[in-house]
């Protein structure tokens, strides 16, 4: 399924849950540094997303944190119970297979594509930071979609995922 079809399916799913969104179209971006000039005017929590696997390639995690967080994979591995040194970045092939998005497009909004293989880790600051909106790519890195933190959680749970909420402060 093409990115535009996946985005349309995402928008349909959000609509079915009565979730209102705000979308900003922008040039394709592959890094936070490239993205921020296009969306820094949007008030709220902007995301950085990491698609990770364990050393044995048996488990996958999508980790969503505030865009300016630095993540230590060893510390995160300990928090997730897989041990220090056991988390790795998953390759694009695995991300395409599990979440139907490629490099630069990792997003928790793609969790509706997952068959239950991916665990979702969410920075608690998205829910506890008093943000009016939280922002993610809508299946493409040429747009950014904002929704309320409450609606975001409703969407995530509707995909069958119970987020692992961690404090990254």
Swiss-Prot record:
Highest rank taxon of the organism: Eukaryota
Single annotated GO MF: aminoacyl-tRNA deacylase activity
Intrachain S-S bonds: none
Gene3D superfamilies associated with the record: YbaK/aminoacyl-tRNA synthetase-associated domain
Pfam families: tRNA_edit
InterPro entries documented for this protein: ProX/PRXD1, YbaK/aa-tRNA-synt-asso_dom_sf, YbaK/aa-tRNA-synth-assoc-dom
Annotated SUPFAM superfamilies: YbaK/ProRS associated domain
Family stated for the protein in its record: Belongs to the PRORSD1 family.
Record's protein name: Prolyl-tRNA synthetase associated domain-containing protein 1
Protein encoded by which gene: Prorsd1
């Amino acid at each position: 399924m093409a990115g535009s079809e996946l985005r349309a399916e995402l928008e349909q799913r959000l609509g079915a849950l009565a979730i209102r969104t705000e979308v900003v179209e922008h040039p394709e971006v592959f890094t936070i540094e490239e993205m921020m000039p296009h969306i820094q005017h949007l008030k709220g929590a902007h995301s950085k997303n990491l698609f990770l696997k364990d050393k044995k390639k048996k488990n996958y995690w999508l980790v969503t944190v505030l865009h300016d967080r630095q993540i230590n994979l060893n510390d995160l591995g300990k928090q997730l119970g897989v041990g220090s040194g056991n988390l790795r970045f998953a390759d694009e092939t695995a991300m395409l297979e599990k979440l139907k998005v490629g490099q630069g497009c990792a997003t928790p909004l793609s969790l509706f594509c997952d068959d239950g293989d991916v665990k979702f880790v969410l920075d608690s600051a998205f829910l506890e930071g008093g943000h009016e909106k939280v922002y993610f790519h809508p299946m493409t890195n040429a747009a950014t979609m904002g929704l309320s933190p409450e609606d975001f959680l409703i969407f995530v749970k509707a995909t069958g995922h119970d987020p692992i909420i961690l404090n990254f402060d």
